[in-house]
Amino acid sequence: MAEINQTKCDLAFQISYHPIYRLAQFWTLSVSLLAVPSLLYFLLKRVLLLPFHGNLKCLLITYFSSIFLYALVLCFDFSYQCLIPFIVTTKCSLIIDQTLYKCGHMTSLFFLTTPMLLPFGFSIERFVAVGMAYKYEKMRTLLGPILCFILVAPNFVVFYFLFRDEQFTDSFISFLVLPNTPAVQFNNYLWFLLYAKIGNFCCNCVLLIFHKRFKNTYLKKKTSLSVRYALEEISNSSKFTLILTFTHLVFFGAYTIGSILVRTLGESFFGNFLNFYVARGVNCAVPTYNLLIAFVGLISLRQLNSRRHAKILTKVLIRVTGQEGARNYDDIIMQQWNTVSNRTR
């Protein structure tokens, strides 16, 4: 037993000081430390102040809050993994304590998968918004909280069945490396989420096409200004959620395919177990997404708002010069005379 433990300690030492592994650890820590204030600013200064309906705002707040919490957890995980090699006195001290690993591992994976589930709520809420555009703005904020609960609760159930028989008796130097027992099932769960996210992205694209035709049909009718405003807000918010869904799909797809590809290629492809474990420990896609999504959100909101203001100016601005200005002036005078004449009858 002592010999086996010493072998694991030697392996932990070799992996921890591997240059590629160390570089990936510091990269993840750096982007996570930057992501925390960026996400907090975006959440408090942008998401909470969005003019969207309360149902969508509830989903967005939950979505970005879960990403923020995941970035916080990664800050703890990778601070530990980056700093411990500088202060340990024995090789075996590099192995994470069983209880600490269990808490850090479960929390990390839970907040990794939770933001992957919430975009399904975006699609459901958007379809309801388009279908009830004429009165959606007056509806209570009820659908959003219900969708948040329905989408997050199954994640607890999945994790319970994945890890209920896991004893966490193996040795680990990374909080994100899966134990062998639930690894296959968790990878299948990731594949399911990836396929579902691809389908969800396609649904978002169909929704935007349908909404465009739906809006054009409504605008041809004599609809009220409030309905026109609601249709425009639904269009902008749907485009924003589509950008979020696509960005998340790209980074999560890279993470899922990369992680499963490493396991599929196996130790023989990487030459030895050391290189294989290093490849398993390099997970930079999702932590990088945590940082970039705040900037993607800021830029996309700024562009959508500028386009909306430009569209409003082109449609609402009344010309006051030239022949068109003269016609507009005559129309306004005639409307005033008609109003006065109707009152005197």
Curated annotation (Swiss-Prot):
Please list the GO biological process terms of this entry. sensory perception of chemical stimulus
Topological type in the membrane: Multi-pass membrane protein
Chief place of localization: membrane
- What GO cellular component term, any one, is given? perikaryon
Q: What InterPro entries does the entry give?
A: 7TM_GPCR_serpentine_rcpt_Srb
Q: Which residues are sugar-modified?
A: N5
Q: Which Pfam families match?
A: 7TM_GPCR_Srb
Q: Which domain of life is it from?
A: Eukaryota
Q: In which tissues is it expressed?
A: Expressed throughout the head.
Spans traversing the lipid bilayer: 23-43, 58-78, 104-124, 143-163, 190-210, 242-262, 281-301
Q: Which GO terms describe its molecular function?
A: G protein-coupled receptor activity
Spans within the Extracellular topological domain: 1-22, 79-103, 164-189, 263-280
* Keyword list, A-Z: Cell membrane, Cell projection, G-protein coupled receptor, Glycoprotein, Membrane, Receptor, Transducer, Transmembrane, Transmembrane helix
Location(s), subcellular: Cell membrane; Perikaryon; Cell projection, Dendrite
Which sequence ranges are listed under topological domain Cytoplasmic?
44-57, 125-142, 211-241, 302-345
As for what it does, the entry says: G-protein coupled receptor. Plays a role in the navigational capacity of sperm and promotes the targeting of sperm derived from males to the fertilization site in the uterus of hermaphrodites.
Q: What family name appears in the similarity comment?
A: Belongs to the nematode receptor-like protein srb family.
This protein's name: Serpentine receptor class beta-5
The record's gene field reads srb-5
